UniProtKB/Swiss-Prot annotation:
Translation initiation factor that is able to deliver tRNA to the P-site of the eukaryotic ribosome in a GTP-independent manner. The binding of Met-tRNA(I) occurs after the AUG codon finds its position in the P-site of 40S ribosomes, the situation that takes place during initiation complex formation on some specific RNAs. Its activity in tRNA binding with 40S subunits does not require the presence of the aminoacyl moiety. Possesses the unique ability to deliver non-Met (elongator) tRNAs into the P-site of the 40S subunit. Its main location: cytoplasm. It is found in: Cytoplasm. PROSITE patterns: PUA (PS50890), SUI1 (PS50296), SWIB_MDM2 (PS51925). The lineage of its organism: Eukaryota, Metazoa, Chordata, Craniata, Vertebrata. GO terms for cellular component: cytoplasm; cytosol; nuclear body. Residues 478-548 form the SUI1 domain. The keyword Protein biosynthesis applies. One of its GO terms (biological process) is formation of translation preinitiation complex. This is Eukaryotic translation initiation factor 2D. Residues 93-173 form the PUA domain. The gene is Eif2d. Coiled coil: none annotated. Belongs to the eIF2D family.
Amino acid sequence: MFAKAFRVKSNTAIKGSDRRKLRADVTAAFPALGTDQISELIPGKEELNVVKLYVHKGDSVTVYTSGGNPILFELEKNLYPTVYTLWAYPDILPTFITWPLVLEKLVGGADLMLPGVVVPPTGLPQVQQGDLCAIALVGNRAPVAIGVAAMSTAQMLASGLKGKGVSVLHTYQDHLWRSGDKSSPPAIAPLDPTDSCEEKVHLGLQGNLKSLTLDGEEENGQVPLREASEDTSSRAPSQDSLDGKPLQEQMDDLLLRCFLHALKSRVKKADLPLLTSTLLGSHMFSCCPEGQQLDIKKSSYKKLSKFLQHMQQEQIVQVKELSKGVESIVAVDWRHPRITSFVIPEPSLTSQTVQEVSREQPYLPPDIKSLYCVPANMTQLFLESGHKKGSTLEGSEVRKIITDYAKRNRLVDADNRNLVKLDPILCDCILEKNEQHLVTKLPWDCLLTRCLKNMQPAYQVTFPGQEPILKKGKLCPIDITLALKTYNKKVTVVRNLETYGLDPCSVAAILQQRCQASTIVSPAPGAKDSLQVQVQGNQIHHLGQLLLEEYRLPGKYIQGLEKAPKPGKK
């Protein structure tokens, strides 16, 4: 609901009577809150504001703010807590658990699909269809989203955990969260941690549970969790086994594991020399086991450069400063015992979850319209037709407005109806200063062309089943370029995938498999919050097949396809 910017209608301090009514409504809506907690949430004397706003879908929403943070919002006479409130009182709603990678999808406006739900040993929370519920991530009880259950718990289990689980209304990092102090979720330990004895029983029964899964039987949704435990144990020591180690030693082990995993499964000889920052950002982070987070500052090395110096001393890699202040890995000994003895883990449960979700939601190309915004100096021309500064119009609408304006003001030349006389308003809108006293008439096509040229470009992108997204400026096409790296090696670089609803990481994974070439996802230079995909070699032919044939994007939105290798040439 708040994935896109909203428009504030009013912001006023709450009245005393309204404050008392709100306290009563909160008591009725959230019976798990005690009297003291309600007094903390809605204090008697501290400032409390009521904000009326319109979300991008047009719904009217009332938001209650305290201390600069939104604490509650009301939609269709129903009260909902924000993530700020849930961080203070995490147990007032039934909570579903999901993987950290799913959060990005939720922030982008997606609902929580059941394949992405992690089932704890105690089973799913008991909800009925339409019940308010929260969503938290594995390892942290602090909710990151709220929504309403799309089906009851019984229906979820009966469906085999397929389909939509929670219709999401508000998330951490959405625009409602941004209206507050933008704090991050606190670390809240999960309730009822698994007993160590029980964990041993679980590990002993994993083989039986796996066979039960193959037979299609699940009881209380416990199998996926134990499969996850099995998967984690194959890649890294379990959390229970690590509890005896200091945190710094745990992070050292995790850092080495991610490093060896990246070298053995992701980095190829053709990638060298490889920036150390790229090794960390594009390879090591993605090799981190589920439920764990790689943080070099918590290791004994503190910095990546010190860790790589240690790896160089062990003669696993060779690091050089090829340009001032920028280190690169120039050589890797793939025969080193550390690398050869490392066992690559099985695909994680999360990657399977992402694949299931993507299968349920296949990519469909968006509908794209070119639009024009009314600038300040052309406001008078569009005022009579009910449009003001900033209004967006299609080209056909602009043509009709200009035509109607000329006819209504009798500006069509009587002797030559292909010409339009320019009145003061048209002169100010379309003529240059040196033309003001020289040009008195223009042909229709020239008049319309000049009007469109002087208006500000915009575009509207509409994905199937979603609200239109309106953006000002020119629509950037998907940009495919070839670049030469060290030793005259070619790489294919793709930018602007996000504009068309394409996930750069997903595209990189597909290209890596089809082209049998290494890929790197990195921040796009000069573009805020945008990523680029780099593929080893000239892979434009494969890209063209993927974008044009499978994703069915129109060719006019893709530039650089002509650089594909010609048939018969390598």
